Amino acid sequence: VYVLKTESSFPFLQEEILKSEDAEVPFEIGREEEAIQKAYNIFKEKIDQSLAEYLSNKEQTAEDNTKDAADWLSMLRDTVFDLNLILVTLDSEDDAYLIFETLNTRGKDLALADLLRNHFAKLIKAASEVDQVKQKWSKVQDTIKSSPVQLDPDTFIVHSWQSRYDFATKAKVFHKVKDTVNKKNAKSHLDRFVSDAEQWRSIFDTDYLWSKAEKEASRSLAALRTFKVVQPAPGILSLVRAYRDKQIKYRALRNALSNIEKFHFSFNAVTSSRSSGGISGMYSSFGRSIFEADDSSIAAQAIADLVGKLRDREVPAVEFDAGFQQVIYTNKHSSQKTLVQYILKKVAIH
């Protein structure tokens, strides 16, 4: 029987958890390892508490207490040994992928990232000892999870897809991918996710990939984080991608981001306006326009169209003034501290 051993938590699980002696192999601790350590500590704490209760029983002798504790440990061990392992033997590798997806519909939902990795693995067969899908998908995950900013791989996948193809919710993206990605185009789609991962991270982690000469663009992105706005992400991803691919100039990127920043400052940060619908779809549509643009003039027109749509949605001056008067920061009212800091920095710059 072939057993696939986990590598994501290797060698932490083997050295720190399963081994009774001190660890001999150095390892790095990430979020997965922290979760494993937390689970281990919970079990250990509960076992220690139960043993302490047996050993502190004052109604019988210490010898009887020790015997009861040993019997309880034996019972616990036997319970673990009595766990059943279900072995499923399949005729082909494709059947394994099918079962993987079928089980997902019966129990707890798997992460979108896991489903996509499985889909790519089914379509792209390893031509050598190097597992192309495994290496590339690990790069996607590492790029996102190594960010000091808390980022979600599933959200990245949704934004990447919306920026290129169509506006689909997280629940529908996997079905869209399955309908679009086949054996002929799987490699190119996988490569797109790999390249998009870095650009997407730089939208939220503004210390990543941005140079000092690009500080105005990174400031606008940092401002959107201050406003806690994620709706523009698909459109911004296409903008950053086009800039990195030298399809648009830095000036075009900077001006587009500045207009997006100004709109959401008044619409979200100051007035907390509610969208009547369509803003997320608008940014997704804009992202696709940039993605499909054959030259810089078409991209420039797409940016101009977006700026026009943002102006059409501008908050009336009366509403802005009323909202701005409510922006305060004191020792007792500190929830808007970052917004007040943003406003003061803007005043200082200008």
Model-identified regions with their sequence ranges:
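Histidine-centered catalytic micro-motifs used for acid/base chemistry in nuclease
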Residues: 350
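Glycine- and hydrophobic-rich flexible loops that cap the catalytic core of alpha/beta enzyme folds
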Residues: 1-167
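A cross-family structural signal marking well-folded subdomains
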Residues: 57-62, 84, 113-343
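Active-site-proximal helix-loop elements at catalytic-domain edges
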Residues: 346
